[in-house]
């Protein structure tokens, strides 16, 4: 009676839970919004009618984000988190008999959504250093005649990025819709693919406000694409999905973007410091990061995960991903949280 694809899909779980003295397992921004800004947001929200539906789409929030990006409003659509936008795009691009190419490892939701749509999944392994194999992606897309390509860059869980030129090579070569998921772009050394949208009608760029903008609890995401493509991929989208509170919050944060800039600078400085200290710890291999999180390889990831959790520090065991045996992932936290983690790792 149910979708047969459910037999091959597991319920999403966060190993170790979501509570800890030092929580570094979900790639979150360690800085919450300041109280004065929350008060401003709530004061505005109090004057909104709570008994009325919000707009079908949050047009004011979309216009504000388009202005922030420097693009036309008709290129932008807002969603209830980037995950909701992923559901929408996958529904629009895939179905039985169609194929999607996913570099592996990548964000686990991609594979889940593809299988729910009963689409074929073409996996292209990363290099051993977890970097993208661009030539293999292009070759597989042609050979398999895929309809859709999903590129998480910077990538979760590997923390590696495609260069701007590499993205353009793939988009230009592909006879397919290409989704570039830029959830972590604010932390990257590489240039965004946004400027390619005017030249490539098959390109979609995905953004989230959950990471750099510290709005994970508000659920705000965006897709940016040419108007014709955006109109088509928006057809399956759930109406009224974005709350007025989320829209007001987004606009307030964009008006005070120096808070984001300061947080990103802090995180990048801490990332560099953590990487430098990790390289001095015997038995730990550190992969260079282009995100707000780091990947390390240890002798026994399950044992290290357990010891850290017992000491009050929650990280993510990503050993189940291809090429990531005995790897752990943790986001950059506050300096004192990072020091706690480093101290424990040095004692292992």
Swiss-Prot record:
UniProt-listed Pfam families: Aminotran_1_2
Q: In which pathway does it act?
A: Amino-acid biosynthesis; L-histidine biosynthesis; L-histidine from 5-phospho-alpha-D-ribose 1-diphosphate: step 7/9
Q: Which Gene Ontology terms describe the biological processes this protein takes part in?
A: L-histidine biosynthetic process
* UniProt GO molecular function: histidinol-phosphate transaminase activity; pyridoxal phosphate binding
The EC code for this enzyme is 2.6.1.9
List modified residues, type N6-(pyridoxal phosphate)lysine.
Answer: 211
Whether Transferase counts among this entry's keywords is yes
Q: Which cofactor does it need?
A: pyridoxal 5'-phosphate
Entries under SUPFAM superfamilies matching the protein: PLP-dependent transferases
Q: Which reaction does it catalyse?
A: L-histidinol phosphate + 2-oxoglutarate = 3-(imidazol-4-yl)-2-oxopropyl phosphate + L-glutamate
Q: Which UniProt keywords apply?
A: Amino-acid biosynthesis, Aminotransferase, Histidine biosynthesis, Pyridoxal phosphate, Transferase
Q: Which CDD domains match?
A: AAT_like
- By its UniProt entry, which HAMAP family does this protein fall under? HisC_aminotrans_2 (MF_01023)
Similarity-based family: Belongs to the class-II pyridoxal-phosphate-dependent aminotransferase family. Histidinol-phosphate aminotransferase subfamily.
Subunit and interaction comment: Homodimer.
Can you say what this protein is called? Histidinol-phosphate aminotransferase
Q: Which organism is it from?
A: Chlorobaculum tepidum (strain ATCC 49652 / DSM 12025 / NBRC 103806 / TLS)
């Amino acid at each position: 009676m149910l979708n047969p694809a459910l037999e091959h899909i597991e319920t999403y779980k966060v190993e170790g839970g979501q509570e800890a003295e030092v929580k570094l397992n979900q790639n979150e921004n360690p800085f919450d919004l300041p109280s004065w800004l929350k008060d401003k947001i709530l004061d505005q929200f109090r004057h909104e009618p709570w008994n009325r539906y919000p707009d079908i789409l949050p047009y004011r929030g979309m216009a504000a984000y388009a202005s922030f990006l420097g693009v036309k409003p008709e290129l932008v659509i807002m969603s209830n988190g980037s995950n909701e936008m992923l559901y929408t795009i996958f529904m629009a691009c895939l179905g039985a008999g169609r194929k999607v190419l996913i570099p592996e490892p990548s964000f686990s939701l991609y594979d889940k959504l593809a299988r729910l749509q009963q689409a074929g999944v073409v996996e292209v392994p990363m290099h051993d250093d977890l970097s993208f194999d661009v030539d293999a992606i292009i070759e597989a897309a042609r050979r398999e005649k895929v309809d859709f390509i999903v590129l998480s860059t910077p990538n979760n869980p590997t923390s590696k990025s495609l260069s701007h030129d590499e993205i353009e090579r793939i988009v230009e070569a592909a006879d397919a819709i290409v989704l570039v998921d830029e959830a972590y772009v604010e932390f990257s050394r590489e240039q965004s693919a946004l400027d390619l949208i005017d030249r490539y009608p098959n390109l979609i760029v995905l953004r989230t406000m959950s990471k750099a903008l510290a709005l994970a609890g508000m659920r705000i995401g965006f897709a940016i694409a040419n108007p014709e493509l955006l109109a088509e991929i928006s057809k399956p989208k759930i109406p009224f999905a974005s709350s007025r509170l989320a829209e007001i919050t987004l606009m307030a944060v964009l008006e005070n973007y120096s808070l984001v800039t300061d947080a990103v600078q802090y995180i990048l400085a801490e990332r560099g410091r953590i990487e430098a200290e990790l390289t001095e710890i015997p038995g730990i291999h550190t992969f260079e990061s282009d995100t707000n999180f780091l990947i390390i390889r240890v002798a026994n990831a399950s044992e290290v995960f357990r010891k850290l959790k017992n000491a009050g520090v929650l990280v993510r065991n990503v050993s189940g991903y291809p090429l990531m045996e005995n790897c752990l992932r943790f986001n950059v936290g506050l300096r004192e949280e990072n020091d706690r983690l480093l101290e424990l790792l040095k004692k292992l």
